Regions:
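Catalytic nucleophile loop
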Residues: 2-28
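Acidic/charged, solvent-exposed loop-and-adjacent secondary-structure segments enriched in E/D, K/R, S/T
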Residues: 31
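Amide-donor transfer/coupling interface in amidating biosynthetic enzymes
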Residues: 1-7, 34-152
């Protein structure tokens, strides 16, 4: 995270990565979602034998060229989540229970791609708008960053 801050490189935080982004910038986490939210929506199974589950995630702001309220079904597997959002981050996607599922830096000029998602895009079905668009925008920003570094 220190490297990303110093060099303003593209950063995609997945699951715990989103949680690290939030805590690094001063936010807090729910320590155990079933106790806090009263739901097992985000991780199926028992505490000793958990497994992936799926649920919907919807955008609450325009992001990555997607319209407001774009929804995808994503793979989820976590028992912690954002409680207090860090200063400098903004929420762009949420689960039906209100848990924050997508964040980005507020300063998109300094950090063109500093985005975290609580779900697992690498295990979610292709063709889901949030999954596809997050990946495509990350790759686009990474290629632009590589071009900037190569021209130095």
């Amino acid at each position: 995270m220190l490297w990303v801050e110093a060099h303003q490189t593209p950063c995609l935080g997945i699951c715990r990565g989103l949680q690290w982004m939030n805590v690094f910038l001063g936010g807090t986490l729910h320590p155990h979602l079933p106790d806090e939210l009263g739901t097992h929506m985000h991780r199926a199974g028992s505490p000793t034998h958990s497994r992936d589950t799926t649920h919907s995630v919807s955008t609450i702001s325009d992001q990555f060229g997607m319209d407001l309220s774009t929804t995808s079904v994503v793979v989820s597997h976590h028992h912690q989540g954002i409680d207090a959002l860090a200063p400098g981050l903004t929420t762009w996607a949420v689960a039906p229970d209100g848990l924050i599922e997508g964040v980005r830096r507020t300063d998109t000029l300094k950090f063109p791609f500093y985005t975290g998602v609580q779900w697992h895009p690498e295990r979610s079905a292709a063709g889901q708008p949030l999954v596809d668009q997050v990946g495509l925008h990350f790759l686009r920003c990474a290629r632009m960053q590589r071009g900037k570094l190569a021209s130095r």
